[in-house]
C-alpha cells in the first residue's frame, strides 16, 4: 500500500474543502492530514452487522465528530440513504467505509461530492481502486473489519492510543464474523444482542468496549427471551430441501440464529428475505459448513454484484429470478 504521507501530497485531487456556515470556503488541506486529524468530521458508512457496528465504535472513538451510517445490500433503503448522505457534502469532511468496499455507484457519488475517502475492509470480493487519487485502501483478509480498524488506527499508522478497552470487543466480533468459534458462546451471544438492540442502541451500549468479566444483566435477560422467539419464528417459515443436501428457508429476521442451527445440518443453506429491500427484490444469504467450496467466489463469478466469504456470502436478486439463480449457484458449487 502506498505510504499515506507520500500519497496525500498530490494536489489538487487530495484537497478537502472546509466550508464556513454561510457556505463560503474557509480553506483546504490534504488528504493525509485529515486521516491524521482526529477532529475531522467523518461520514462513516459501515456494514450493518455486528462487525460493521464494532468497526463504527472504533471509528467513533478515533474521530469523535464522526457520524456512523449503517449500509447493507444495494437496492435497499439504507443504500439509498448512504448515497444521500454522501451528496450532503457540507455536513462532513471525508468518508470512511468500514467492513465493506464501495461499488461503482457509490464511488461516483463520492467523486461528485469531491471528497477523499478511506476503505477498511477484509472481504475476499473487495474491489480495490488503488489508483483512485481520492482514496486510500486498507484491505486485508484474515481479520474482520472491526479488528482491522482497531489495528489500523492504533498500530498501522499509530494515530491513537488508549483504546485497549475496545480490543476485546473487536476480538469477539472477529471470532463471530470469521466463524472461528473459539470464543463461544460469547461471540454468538454478542451477535444476538446486536440484532436485539439494533445498530444505534448497540453502538451506544458498547461504545466503551466489552468487559472481560462478561455481559451485563440486561444483555443476559435479552438472551433468555430470545431463544423462545426464535423457535416460534422458525416453525412458521416457508422451507424446502434443495439438491446437493441443501436447504432453503424464507426469513426476514433471526438469520444468525437460523444459520447457527441449520448450517451444521446441510452442505449449503439459503436464507431468502424481502424486508429492507426494494419491492420485487429478494436478499439471498448463502452459507456452507464445507471448506472445499467457495460461495463468495462463486457469486462473484456470476458477475451480479454479490459476494462475501468462502463460507458465507450474499446476493440481491429479482424475486422472479430467485429459484433459477439458486439452482445455478448450487450447480456451480457442487458440479465442478
Which residues does each predicted region cover?
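An accessory alpha-helical subdomain
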Residues: 185-229, 243, 247, 251
Amino acid at each position: 500500500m502506498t505510504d499515506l504521507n507520500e500519497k496525500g501530497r498530490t494536489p489538487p485531487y487530495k484537497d478537502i474543502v472546509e466550508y464556513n456556515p454561510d457556505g463560503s470556503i474557509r480553506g483546504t488541506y490534504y488528504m493525509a492530514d485529515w486521516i491524521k486529524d482526529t477532529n475531522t468530521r467523518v461520514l462513516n458508512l459501515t456494514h450493518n452487522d455486528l462487525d460493521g457496528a464494532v468497526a463504527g465504535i472504533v471509528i467513533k472513538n478515533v474521530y469523535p465528530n464522526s457520524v456512523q451510517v449503517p449500509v447493507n445490500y444495494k437496492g435497499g433503503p439504507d443504500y439509498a440513504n448512504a448515497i444521500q448522505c454522501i451528496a450532503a457534502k457540507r455536513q462532513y469532511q471525508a468518508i470512511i467505509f468500514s467492513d465493506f468496499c464501495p461499488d461503482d455507484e457509490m464511488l461516483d457519488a463520492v467523486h461528485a461530492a469531491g471528497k477523499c475517502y478511506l476503505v477498511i475492509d477484509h472481504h475476499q470480493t473487495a474491489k480495490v481502486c488503488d489508483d483512485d487519487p481520492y482514496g486510500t485502501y486498507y484491505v486485508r483478509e484474515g481479520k474482520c473489519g472491526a479488528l482491522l480498524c482497531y489495528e489500523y488506527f492504533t498500530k498501522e499508522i499509530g494515530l491513537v492510543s488508549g483504546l485497549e478497552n475496545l480490543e476485546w470487543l473487536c476480538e469477539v466480533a472477529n471470532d463471530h464474523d470469521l466463524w472461528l468459534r473459539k470464543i463461544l458462546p460469547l461471540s454468538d451471544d454478542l451477535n444476538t444482542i446486536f440484532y436485539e438492540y439494533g445498530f444505534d442502541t448497540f453502538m451506544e451500549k458498547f461504545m466503551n468496549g466489552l468487559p472481560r468479566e462478561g455481559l451485563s444483566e440486561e444483555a443476559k435477560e435479552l438472551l433468555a427471551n430470545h431463544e423462545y422467539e426464535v423457535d416460534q419464528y422458525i416453525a412458521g417459515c416457508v422451507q424446502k430441501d434443495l439438491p446437493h443436501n441443501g436447504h432453503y428457508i424464507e426469513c426476514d429476521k433471526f438469520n444468525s440464529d437460523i444459520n447457527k442451527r441449520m448450517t451444521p445440518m446441510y452442505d449449503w443453506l439459503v436464507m431468502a428475505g424481502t424486508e429492507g429491500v426494494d419491492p420485487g427484490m429478494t436478499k439471498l444469504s448463502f452459507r456452507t459448513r464445507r471448506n472445499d467450496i467457495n460461495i463468495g467466489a462463486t457469486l462473484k463469478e456470476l458477475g451480479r454484484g454479490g459476494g462475501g466469504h468462502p463460507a458465507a456470502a450474499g446476493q440481491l436478486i429479482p424475486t422472479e429470478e430467485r429459484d433459477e439463480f439458486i439452482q445455478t449457484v448450487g450447480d456451480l458449487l457442487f458440479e465442478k
